[in-house]
Amino acid sequence: MKGEQIGVFYHKSRFERKEFGSFFLSETPEVMSKGWDADFRRMCVWTKLFDKQSNQAFYVFCTHFDHIGTKARIESARLIVSKIKTIAGNSPIILVGDLNSSPQDTEMYHLLADYLTDTAISAIKKTIPTAGTFNGYDMKISDFQANQKIDYIFIQKFKGLDYRVLNDRYNDLSYPSDHFPVMCVVSY
């Protein structure tokens, strides 16, 4: 497949993959396609993991919303909530991704936040040295605005313990990505 590739990484020593799949963020999600007013084909991948330590199964969904299409982001959020309900049912959920949109983009954000919990808000401990998660490779920390938070970790039936935005520079010269890594320690 040409274009975007998204993966879910996990430790095989702790987790066993039980199921996996993907769908496109479009009106025809089962077919490779570009949706609504999107500039690129975008997708969501998912996997069902079994935690060998806790004997619990849960689902991880990973996505990347379009950076141009406002309607595409709104409809992608609506589609993901629908797919999560269909695929995962009542199971614990983790949804991660670059949503290319701030929480102030209320319709897109609330479609997700009304069903899932944003760990940036709900986690017991938060280490957020910057307001945003997008750095453009060379932005100074002082340049960050709250509306530059475009990367998210949403959960359902988990408790967010420690949410962090990691803003380390490589050799103090540049960032390894145009986005800061976002992480959250969770528990059942």
Question: Across the structure, where does each feature detected by a protein language model lie?
Answer:
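Alpha-helical elements of Rossmann-like donor-binding domains used by nucleotide-donor carbohydrate transfer enzymes
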Residues: 4, 46, 75-83, 107
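Active-site metal-binding loops of divalent metal-dependent hydrolases
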Residues: 63-65, 98-99, 180
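Hydrophobic, aromatic-enriched interface-forming segments
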Residues: 62-67, 71-76, 80
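Metal-dependent phosphoester-hydrolase catalytic domains
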Residues: 71, 75, 85-93, 101-188
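Conserved hydrophobic/aromatic beta-strand scaffold that supports enzyme active sites
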Residues: 6-8, 44-48, 62, 152-153, ...
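Short beta-strand segments enriched in hydrophobic/aromatic residues
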Residues: 51, 64-65, 186-188
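Structured beta-strand-rich core segments of catalytic domains in phosphoester-bond hydrolases
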Residues: 1-57, 165
